[in-house]
Design a protein with these regions (language model features):
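N-terminal signal-anchor transmembrane alpha helix
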Residues: 3-32
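Extracytosolic (periplasmic/ER-lumenal) interhelical loops and adjacent juxtamembrane/interface segments
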Residues: 33-64
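Membrane-proximal helix-loop-helix units in multi-pass membrane proteins
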Residues: 103-143
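Terminal transmembrane helical module of multi-pass membrane proteins
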Residues: 142-215
């Protein structure tokens, strides 16, 4: 397997791993049951039980928090490896470089969130959230500016839509605005677009590599 395909595989694995951890760890909750509408993703990694968050108090008790934090660390590693291994395939220029670096910063956010659960070090965890929320979504918007790239250049529309969706999710989540899916649901709208984007990019890297080999 060449470098590009290995990097694409890392990106294609990161999203199902993270989503599976969200589902499985959430199903382990008993008192209270986990709610995607009410609870934050971070609540799955909290190491203590009790009422959490003074701005939006909610009961939290995650028996499998170690599994969630381990999955976040693995997601961070896969996202970072995806960036580094597919670096040449994503194109040249300031926009392509900026998109790579911003995505790498988001990967660092996942690593920091895993190392500093919200109830252990709230300040560091908030910094991790900002790296994911702000820089991750900004990276997709910057990627929408990439022109001459068989990978990013061919998905400018998807980058723009997903980046804009993520930014809207961030603003609504931070403003604690519920548009029908709960404030916790809005956090998913802020976080999941980047994960979907990496799947799309990974798939395009694989197709671009196959096209090169056949030409």
């Amino acid at each position: 397997m060449d470098r590009d395909r290995l990097g694409a595989a890392c990106w294609l694995l990161a999203t199902p791993l993270f989503l599976a951890a969200n589902v499985v760890v959430g199903l382990a909750w008993r008192q209270p049951p986990f709610s995607w509408a009410t609870h934050n993703i971070s609540d799955l990694g909290n190491v203590t039980c009790g009422v959490w968050d003074s701005t939006r108090p909610r009961p939290v008790c995650s028996p499998w928090h170690d599994a969630m934090n381990g999955a976040m660390a693995a997601t961070a590693a896969l996202l970072a490896l995806g960036v580094l291994l597919t670096w040449p395939a994503l194109g040249r220029g300031l926009a392509a470089t900026g998109a790579r670096l911003l995505t790498l910063a988001a990967a660092a956010g996942y690593a920091l969130a895993a190392a500093a659960p919200a109830d252990v070090d709230e300040n560091r965890h908030f910094l991790a959230a900002l790296l994911i929320f702000v820089l991750g979504n900004l990276g997709m918007l910057v990627a929408a500016l990439v022109g001459r790239s068989p990978v990013l250049g061919g998905m400018r529309g998807a980058s723009l839509v997903l980046g804009s969706t993520g930014v809207a999710g961030v603003l609504l989540f931070l403003g604690q605005v519920d548009v029908g899916v709960g404030v916790g649901g809005m956090e998913r709208v802020a976080v999941f677009p980047l994960l979907l984007w990496t799947v799309l990019v990974g798939a395009r890297v694989v197709r671009a590599g196959r096209a090169r080999r056949l030409s």
